[in-house]
From Swiss-Prot:
The gene is rplE. It comes from Prochlorococcus marinus subsp. pastoris (strain CCMP1986 / NIES-2087 / MED4). Part of the 50S ribosomal subunit; part of the 5S rRNA/L5/L18/L25 subcomplex. Contacts the 5S rRNA and the P site tRNA. Forms a bridge to the 30S subunit in the 70S ribosome. GO terms for cellular component: ribonucleoprotein complex; ribosome. This is Large ribosomal subunit protein uL5. The lineage of its organism: Bacteria, Bacillati, Cyanobacteriota, Cyanophyceae, Synechococcales. This is one of the proteins that bind and probably mediate the attachment of the 5S RNA into the large ribosomal subunit, where it forms part of the central protuberance. In the 70S ribosome it contacts protein S13 of the 30S subunit (bridge B1b), connecting the 2 subunits; this bridge is implicated in subunit movement. Contacts the P site tRNA; the 5S rRNA and some of its associated proteins might help stabilize positioning of ribosome-bound tRNAs. Pfam families: Ribosomal_L5 (PF00281), Ribosomal_L5_C (PF00673). InterPro entries: Ribosomal_uL5, Ribosomal_uL5_bac-type, Ribosomal_uL5_C, Ribosomal_uL5_CS, Ribosomal_uL5_dom_sf, Ribosomal_uL5_N. GO terms for molecular function: rRNA binding; structural constituent of ribosome; tRNA binding. Belongs to the universal ribosomal protein uL5 family.
């Protein structure tokens, strides 16, 4: 059973009862997943950006968007409009398949993993976590990477509070540490 069908058939009715909501449409749901990677070395190394775009496309199943600098900063040696990162916004079926792979396959592969931090909510039910290396994803092989790079993953939910967001992610299978 996919994560999407499990959410619709089992998780949503359970959350409706647990949170004491009156309407099925009030139950929090995952709206989108943002996968972002900042590349400081892209200013001097153009191959880093290309490799990063390929890795993001492999991990998410969707082409990454190149993010560019808004203004020049001499201290970082970047000019306005220079490519400094990449981002992918996942919605719908791709979002659910990414979340399923991330929670069930990638997170357990993190070294010394004891669960994700339960305090990383933003106050509005959205959850953000950083991943230190891309090798936790089974799609990426050690032989094909040039250097280890991390990424930020933001899970945007329709929950209005952190408690609702945490309840949703816990039901989806997110392993929170105590």
């Amino acid at each position: 059973m996919t994560l999407k069908t499990r959410y619709k058939e089992a998780i949503r009715p359970k959350l409706l009862k647990d949170l004491g909501l009156k309407n099925i449409h009030q139950v929090p749901k995952v709206i989108k997943v943002n996968v972002n990677r900042g590349l400081g070395e892209a200013a001097s190394n153009s191959k880093a950006l290309e490799a990063s775009l390929n890795e993001m496309a492999t991990i998410t199943g969707q082409k990454a968007l190149v993010t560019r600098s808004k203004k020049a900063i001499a201290g970082f040696k970047i000019r306005e409009g220079m490519a400094i990162g990449c981002t992918v916004t996942l919605r719908g079926d791709r979002m659910y398949s990414f979340l399923e792979r991330f929670i069930n396959l990638a997170l357990p592969r993190i070294r010394d993993f004891r669960g994700v931090n339960p305090k990383s909510f933003d106050g509005r039910g959205n959850y953000t976590l950083g991943v230190k290396e891309q090798l936790i994803f089974p799609e990426i092989s050690f032989d094909k990477i040039d250097s280890i790079r991390g990424m930020d993953i933001t899970i945007v939910t329709s929950a209005s509070t952190d408690q609702e967001g945490k309840a949703l992610l816990k039901e989806l299978g997110m392993p929170f540490s105590n």
